[in-house]
Curated annotation (Swiss-Prot):
It comes from Lactococcus lactis subsp. cremoris (strain MG1363). It is a lipid-anchor. GO terms for biological process: peptide transport; protein transport. It comes from the Bacteria. This is Dipeptide-binding protein. One of its GO terms (molecular function) is peptide transmembrane transporter activity. Coiled coil: none annotated. Part of the ABC transporter DppABCDF involved in dipeptide transport. Binds di- and tripeptides with high affinity. Requires a free N-terminal alpha-amino group and an alpha-peptide bound contiguous with the N-terminal amino group, has a strong selectivity for L-residues, and shows preference for dipeptides containing methionine or arginine, followed by hydrophobic tripeptides consisting of leucine or valine residues.
Length: 550
């Protein structure tokens, strides 16, 4: 946490750290940064991408009206100015002059109008459309109640447009840095249709970097490169001519390549690997605003069996599973560097109106109590007329921390809850995303990283009907608390906003609707010669715009 930034009437912590601030100048023979990610890029379509690893790439080749800087500010990017009305409902945006796409097309206000309407169009199916909910008309369009023309955005000229909000949103400038708010070149999207963003040659770029035909991303390959974008308005600030990405799912391989000088950045994802490399030059730990948690299928369909379906709808069963979770031991065994979760919103992301860490303020009693867990388990089974139960637990098998966590939980649950059989379902990360989104699971180990530094980036996930509410539960208490925090009149009173968000956390806990496991940290090895790389614990994790090897 670098700086607490007060925006309007809400307190937001923009968590950002600039790593090894630049000193000196680049050499004429610059070495390309070799950067690894642990799983495949799913998409470059900024309207529909959902995972952090796709964002780590897309966020460096695309850009929005704002970009979070090294001090945690929502700094102007494509926008030359953003003027806000006194009531906080109207934003007048003026774009920088002579903006261009990487293909030479002019980037204009119409590209934002098109993109935002595409995002909220139900036909697009964007899971991030809910982030557009701050804009007037968006929610009714998403739900199919209104036409696209009612969205609160209007192009006044090629370089100016106005935005009307549904409610004052103190963190709206941070939302403008999110991929779903990025512009799109309609000509290119129309050309490729549903194939847009499925490979780098079917995408166009406006950010610091771009793809070329050389070392392109085909949609499936493990090695690809991005290059400095000559049409980028701030190209003098881009310090690397080329950055090479490698998809390396085996963390041991990544560590070996780092020590051989073939990688400059790699994540360490197993306990043994972390302990073995704590004294390795370049070892560091990135604290993320991210929570790993278990979702329970409460939709009434698509569970592994009728018994599983009715069991997960039973609060005693869910509470027993929560109480049988030894979070401290999970962290010690499978997730070194992380900390046991005490709420859904993670520690270190935002502060209350009094300056207290929000997660500390909203802490719930997510404790380990195997005795009480057994009692509730027996009670739940009796209510259901069962003596034994089989549940599946799905996790990303190509991500070592997820696999290790799932293995630990399988053993712990079967030991603590008599009659329970846990069937592990370890699948590729992409499939885990799809299964969760389609409700094809009993229990799934999920993770959420904050898109901006305010509790709503976490708590809006579980409102009734929200696209990321994969368990499909509904709580009026939760919905009412979240609505009160984010709408007038209380949205304008920070202390009341804090109270309502805390009430939402309490509703999650009391209903045992989810099971928070840990607040995530990412141990990594990074070449000490890398300078100018900015790490953000929310939004774009690794901003490579000014990064290079000195």
């Amino acid at each position: 946490m670098k700086q607490a930034k007060i925006i309007g009437l809400s307190t937001v912590i923009a968590l950002s750290g600039i790593i090894l601030v630049a000193c000196g100048s680049k050499t004429s023979e610059q070495k390309n940064i070799q950067f690894s990610i642990p799983t495949d890029v799913a998409s470059l379509d900024t309207t529909i991408l959902t995972d952090q690893y796709s964002y780590d790439v897309a966020g460096n080749v695309e850009e929005g009206l704002t970009r979070v800087d090294s001090k945690g500010n929502a700094a102007l990017a494509l926008a030359k100015s953003i003027d806000v009305s006194k009531d906080g409902l109207t934003y007048t945006v003026t774009l920088k002059d002579n903006l261009k796409w990487s293909n030479g097309d002019k980037l204009t206000a119409k590209d934002f109008v098109y993109s935002w309407k595409r995002a909220v169009d139900p036909k697009t199916g964007s899971e991030y459309a809910y982030l557009m909910g701050a804009v007037s008309g968006a929610n009714d369009i998403i739900s199919g109640k209104s036409s696209l023309d009612t969205l609160g955005i209007k192009a006044e000229s090629d370089t100016e447009f106005t935005v009307t909000l549904a409610q004052p949103t103190p963190y709206f400038k941070f939302l403008l840095s999110e991929p779903v708010y990025y512009p799109l070149d309609q000509k290119v999207v129309d050309k490729y249709g549903k194939q847009y963003g499925t490979s780098s040659d079917k995408t166009v770029y406006n950010g610091p970097f771009m793809f070329k035909s050389d070392k392109a991303w085909t949609g499936t390959n493990k090695n690809f490169s991005i290059y400095a974008n000559p049409n980028y308005y701030d190209k003098s600030a881009v310090k690397s001519k080329q950055i090479d990405f490698q998809v390396i799912s085996n963390a041991n391989t990544g560590a070996q390549l780092y020590k051989q000088g073939k990688l400059d950045f790699t994540l360490l994802s197993t306990t043994d690997l972390i302990n073995a490399n704590k004294k390795t030059e370049g070892y560091t730990v990135f604290k993320q605003a991210r929570t790993d948690y278990i979702e329970y299928n409460q939709s009434g369909k698509n569970a592994s069996s009728p018994d599983a379906q009715k069991a997960l709808a039973n609060q005693d069963i869910r509470q027993a599973l929560n109480l049988a979770t030894n979070r401290a031991e999970v962290v010690k065994t499978a997730l070194p560097g992380s900390t046991a979760a005490t709420s859904f919103t993670p520690v270190g992301m935002s502060k209350t109106s009094t300056g207290e860490d929000f997660a500390t303020y909203a802490k719930q009693d997510y404790s380990y109590d195997p005795t009480k867990a057994k009692e509730l388990w027996a009670k739940g089974l009796k209510e259901l007329g069962l003596t034994k139960l089989s549940l599946s637990l799905e996790a990303a098998g190509d991500l070592a921390p997820s696999e290790a966590t799932a293995n630990f939980l399988q053993t712990a649950y079967q030991q603590n809850l008599p009659g329970l059989t846990v069937n592990l379902k370890l699948v590729p990360f992409k499939q885990r995303l799809n299964d969760a989104q389609n409700g094809n699971f009993d229990m799934v180990l999920s993770g959420w990283g904050g898109d901006y530094a305010e509790p709503s980036t976490f708590l809006q996930l579980f409102t009734t009907g929200q696209s990321y509410n994969d368990g499909k539960f509904s709580s009026k208490t939760y919905d009412d608390a979240f609505k009160a925090a984010t709408t007038t009149p209380d949205v304008l009173e920070p202390a009341k906003v804090d109270e309502h968000y805390k009430a939402a956390e309490a509703a999650l806990y009391e209903g045992s609707y989810i099971n928070p496991i840990d607040f995530q940290a990412n141990p990594a090895l990074m070449n000490p010669k890398i300078t100018g790389l900015e790490f953000h614990s929310t939004g774009l994790a690794y901003d490579l715009k000014s990064a290079y090897i000195k």
